[in-house]
Amino acid sequence: MIDFGNFYSLIAKNHLSHWLETLPAQIANWQREQQHGLFKQWSNAVEFLPEIKPYRLDLLHSVTAESEEPLSAGQIKRIETLMRNLMPWRKGPFSLYGVNIDTEWRSDWKWDRVLPHLSDLTGRTILDVGCGSGYHMWRMIGAGAHLAVGIDPTQLFLCQFEAVRKLLGNDQRAHLLPLGIEQLPALKAFDTVFSMGVLYHRRSPLEHLWQLKDQLVNEGELVLETLVIDGDENTVLVPGDRYAQMRNVYFIPSALALKNWLKKCGFVDIRIADVSVTTTEEQRRTEWMVTESLADFLDPHDPSKTVEGYPAPKRAVLIARKP
């Protein structure tokens, strides 16, 4: 059973303590509910991983843990087998004691695009909405953050995060909670809030922006990364049944339209930090994610379009401040 007690104890002593009025009951309710059919298998994989304290830990340039003496072939095989029980691995990569998890996404590339535009993360308390396996949270810690809290309701991602945490020496500087943004009270407690790869999955994108704003302290920074299309401030794509084979894509604005949405929600100092086409080098099938990936979602005769005929995925990073 994954234990959230350490997180409760941690926030009881800081400016997130008011979250304890609602959070333990929400987590207890989550634990009582019907779990995913494979949750026991996933949590067992975490439990059976060895407890290792890394001799060398690099979270600044990657997520890499190494031991002082190389692990035996049997130890490495044990770790690899247990981590493969947590497939598919979508966000990474991770290098853990000789086990290299080559994930579907090169999330390190996204981090390299985002990091130069951020306010200094040193000492900050951060919320990562839709954090997946938690890769970017570890990079936030590497960049100096005091505490990174991720929320994502996907149970496999929770187990992947806990597996990585265990192999990083049970590091308590990052925590993942199996919740959605709509389950959070207006905490107004985070110095930086990240929402990367979430907005286009929301039926009401402006409501999502308000929810993000409600988590920020005054003068806090929002980092928003999402799909965009080319166009002016009035351009928004509303896909039909699917976009790049995804059913749950609702609104894809232009970067300029997204800037207007942020302004409408009361954000200031809004800037478009980066716009990049997603390539099949950044998102692809690997040994750790063996099903379809981006190459299968693009028109085989015209990779500038999805199989449905829409513009191929392009992502923008916008930075804004809550006044």
Curated annotation (Swiss-Prot):
<comment type="similarity">
    <text>Belongs to the class I-like SAM-binding methyltransferase superfamily. CmoB family.</text>
</comment>
<feature type="binding site">
    <location>
        <position position="200"/>
    </location>
    <ligand>
        <name>carboxy-S-adenosyl-L-methionine</name>
    </ligand>
</feature>
<feature type="binding site">
    <location>
        <position position="105"/>
    </location>
    <ligand>
        <name>carboxy-S-adenosyl-L-methionine</name>
    </ligand>
</feature>
<dbReference type="InterPro" id="IPR027555">
    <property type="entry name" value="Mo5U34_MeTrfas-like"/>
</dbReference>
<keyword id="KW-0808">Transferase</keyword>
<feature type="binding site">
    <location>
        <begin position="152"/>
        <end position="154"/>
    </location>
    <ligand>
        <name>carboxy-S-adenosyl-L-methionine</name>
    </ligand>
</feature>
<keyword id="KW-0819">tRNA processing</keyword>
<feature type="binding site">
    <location>
        <begin position="181"/>
        <end position="182"/>
    </location>
    <ligand>
        <name>carboxy-S-adenosyl-L-methionine</name>
    </ligand>
</feature>
<dbReference type="InterPro" id="IPR029063">
    <property type="entry name" value="SAM-dependent_MTases_sf"/>
</dbReference>
<comment type="subunit">
    <text>Homotetramer.</text>
</comment>
<dbReference type="GO" id="GO:0002098">
    <property type="term" value="P:tRNA wobble uridine modification"/>
</dbReference>
<feature type="binding site">
    <location>
        <position position="110"/>
    </location>
    <ligand>
        <name>carboxy-S-adenosyl-L-methionine</name>
    </ligand>
</feature>
<dbReference type="Pfam" id="PF08003">
    <property type="entry name" value="Methyltransf_9"/>
</dbReference>
<feature type="binding site">
    <location>
        <position position="91"/>
    </location>
    <ligand>
        <name>carboxy-S-adenosyl-L-methionine</name>
    </ligand>
</feature>
<feature type="binding site">
    <location>
        <position position="315"/>
    </location>
    <ligand>
        <name>carboxy-S-adenosyl-L-methionine</name>
    </ligand>
</feature>
<comment type="function">
    <text>Catalyzes carboxymethyl transfer from carboxy-S-adenosyl-L-methionine (Cx-SAM) to 5-hydroxyuridine (ho5U) to form 5-carboxymethoxyuridine (cmo5U) at position 34 in tRNAs.</text>
</comment>
<dbReference type="InterPro" id="IPR010017">
    <property type="entry name" value="CmoB"/>
</dbReference>
<dbReference type="GO" id="GO:0016765">
    <property type="term" value="F:transferase activity, transferring alkyl or aryl (other than methyl) groups"/>
</dbReference>
<feature type="binding site">
    <location>
        <position position="130"/>
    </location>
    <ligand>
        <name>carboxy-S-adenosyl-L-methionine</name>
    </ligand>
</feature>
<protein>
    <recommendedName>
        <fullName>tRNA U34 carboxymethyltransferase</fullName>
        <ecNumber>2.5.1.-</ecNumber>
    </recommendedName>
</protein>
<feature type="binding site">
    <location>
        <position position="196"/>
    </location>
    <ligand>
        <name>carboxy-S-adenosyl-L-methionine</name>
    </ligand>
</feature>
<dbReference type="GO" id="GO:0008168">
    <property type="term" value="F:methyltransferase activity"/>
</dbReference>
